From Swiss-Prot:
Protein name per UniProt: DNA recombination protein RmuC
Domain of life: Bacteria
Pfam families on file: RmuC
Gene name tied to this protein: rmuC
Record-stated family: Belongs to the RmuC family.
Biological processes annotated in GO: DNA recombination
Region annotation (Disordered) ranges: 440-475
NCBIfam families, sorted: PRK10361.1
Coiled-coil spans in chain: 25-200
InterPro entries: DNA_recombination_RmuC
Function field: Involved in DNA recombination.
Annotated source species: Escherichia coli (strain K12)
Length: 475
């Protein structure tokens, strides 16, 4: 019995050992499966992290593209507004020019008709008794006036022809404006990546972009704007604004280019939100620092400059400009407090095109003033001409009255010269050629008629008796 108990005990121990071994085997197998699952989860986690990194990269690229799209949409909206405004002005200017041309043509026709009527009245009134010398004198009076009218007509045609050509050129430039701005924006983005970190290169490139905007605006260097002008202030130190734009009425606008690309470049290359936000704050701080430094220069107080109350701070990179203002709109107010206006290539180009239009209208106004002055002088000349022609007409009237009086004494009335001359012929005076018989007969008849109307008197003079006898014989 003891042996059986021992056998059972051994069997029990063997069973326990086998159970323990089996349990250990299952535990080891479960642990191996857990390790495999953990490795699989680590691999999946690594793949997920890689996908998140790629997703962040693509999100940054997408945001960059969205900013570029918004920038281009803003440029397009601004250009469309500028195009509509310029088109409206062109139509108004064309209508105004057409009205002026019609007025000039009507005035010229009226003047020609008045001159023609005046000349016809003068020639008719003189009854074709004006000799060749008087006609030459009249032509000498009319020739300078005709030359002035021709010169006035040529000046008006040249002025409006030049204005039409300028309008055509402006239309052509506006059509290319969108392509130019889009190209400039793309080049600005590309160069932002190429110029990061080199402040000197960035500054030079900013001046190049500013120069291109000035050239595209239609303004002329040396006439409507000047670059790198060195001016000595009251403290004997020299200041050198990047650009000084001249305005009509003797005013100036100062433009200073500022580049801020380092923080802006790090903003787009940041791999996480914290780095991106930090770079954005540095970019805004850089713009704010440029505003303060530019405000301290106080360009408005430089001697010889009749500048406006503000300076234009030019940021050449359009997306950098929009990013700073989008996140910190208060920058505009801060700039205005320092007498500074923030401008980008698009807004500066619109402002410069407006200044170019102001200069063109100023030139047209000066031409109109010259035309008005010449018209005033022409009016004065015409008034003097009419006064002279009136004096000539009065002289002709007086000459005609004198002619009638002389002819009356010659052939009309009692005792006229022709009647007395015919009486001499009746007395036997020898003549070589008789006076016009009709005129002589009329003169004798007039003399006889006046004699019959008057109270008869006894002639005491023998000559008068012979004259009466001659008249009776003539009848």
């Amino acid at each position: 019995m003891d042996f059986s108990i021992m056998v059972y005990a051994v069997i029990a121990l063997v069973g326990v050992a086998i159970g323990w071994l089996f349990a250990s085997y299952q535990h080891a197998q479960q642990k191996a499966e857990q390790l495999a699952e953990r490795e699989e989860m680590v691999a999946e986690l690594s793949a997920a992290k890689q996908q998140i990194t790629q997703s962040e990269h693509w999100r940054a690229e997408c945001e960059l593209l969205n900013n570029e799209v918004r920038s281009l949409q803003s440029i397009n909206t601004s250009l469309e507004a500028d195009l509509r405004e310029v088109t409206t002005r062109m139509e108004a200017a064309q209508q105004h020019a057409d009205d002026k041309i019609r007025q000039m043509i009507n005035s010229e026709q009226r003047l020609s008709e008045q001159f023609e009527n005046l000349a016809n009245r003068i020639f008719e009134h003189s009854n074709r008794r004006v000799d060749e010398q008087n006609r030459q004198s009249l032509n000498s009076l009319l020739s300078p006036l005709r030359e002035q009218l021709d010169g006035f007509r040529r000046q008006v045609q040249d002025s409006f022809g030049k204005e039409a050509q300028e309008r055509h050129t402006l239309t052509h430039e506006i059509r290319n404006l969108q392509q130019l701005n889009a190209q400039m924006a793309q080049e600005a983005i590309n160069l932002t990546r190429a110029l990061k970190g080199d402040n000197k290169t960035q500054g030079n490139w900013g001046e190049v972009v500013l120069t291109r905007v000035l050239e595209a605006s239609g303004l002329r260097e040396g006439y409507e704007y000047e670059t790198q002008v060195s001016i000595e202030n009251d403290a004997r130190s020299r200041m050198q604004p990047d650009v000084i734009v001249r305005l009509p009425q003797g005013k100036d606008v100062v433009i200073d280019a500022k580049m801020t690309l380092v923080a802006y470049e790090r903003y787009f290359n940041a791999e996480d939100d914290y780095t991106r936000e930090s770079a954005l704050q540095e970019h805004i701080a850089s713009v704010r620092n440029h505003i303060r430094l530019l405000g301290r220069k106080d360009y408005q107080q430089l001697p010889g400059l009749r500048t406006l109350d503000y300076v234009l701070m030019f940021i050449p990179v359009e997306p950098a400009f929009l990013l700073a203002l989008d996140r910190q709109p208060e920058l505009i107010t801060e700039a205005l407090k320092n007498n500074i206006m923030l401008v980008s290539p698009t807004t500066l180009l619109v402002a410069l095109r407006t200044i170019a239009n102001l200069w063109r209208y100023e030139h047209q106004s000066r031409n109109a003033q010259q035309i008005a002055d010449r018209a005033s002088k022409l009016y004065d000349k015409m008034r003097l001409f009419i006064d002279d022609m009136s004096a000539i007409g009065q002289s002709l009237d007086k000459a005609q009255d004198n002619y009638r009086q002389a002819m009356k004494k010659l052939s009309s009335g009692r005792g006229n010269v022709l009647a007395q001359a015919e009486a001499f012929r009746g007395l036997g005076v020898e003549i070589k050629r008789e006076i016009n018989p009709d005129l002589a007969e009329q003169a004798v008849s007039q003399d006889e008629e006046y004699r019959l109307r008057s109270v008869p008197e006894q002639p005491n003079d023998e000559a008068y008796q012979r004259d009466d006898e001659y008249n009776q014989q003539s009848r």
